[in-house]
């Protein structure tokens, strides 16, 4: 299931419901978390 944080966003961990925490878990390759569409 795609990460709801944003396009191309990958999560370090996912909840059992398939959603991810768009905080510290949000990673977008070598880009900053903001690039994933996470909350500022």
Curated annotation (Swiss-Prot):
A GO MF term: metal ion binding
GO process terms (BP): cellular detoxification of metal ion; response to metal ion
Source organism superkingdom: Eukaryota
Induction comment: Strongly induced by cadmium, copper and mercury.
Metal-binding recorded as keyword: yes
Residue ranges that the Swiss-Prot or TrEMBL entry lists as coiled coil: none
Stored Pfam families: Metallothio_5
Keywords: Cadmium, Copper, Metal-binding, Zinc
Keyword check for Glycoprotein: no
Domain text: All cysteine residues are arranged in C-X-C groups. These are thought to be the metal-binding sites in other metallothioneins.
Similarity annotation: Belongs to the metallothionein superfamily. Type 5 family.
Function: This protein binds cations of several transition elements. It is thought to be involved in detoxification processes.
UniProt protein name: Metallothionein-1
Organism whose genome encodes this protein: Drosophila simulans
């Amino acid at each position: 299931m795609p990460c709801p944080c944003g396009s191309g966003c990958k999560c370090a961990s996912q909840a059992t419901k398939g959603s991810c925490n768009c905080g510290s878990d949000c990673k977008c390759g070598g880009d900053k978390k903001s690039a994933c569409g996470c909350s500022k």
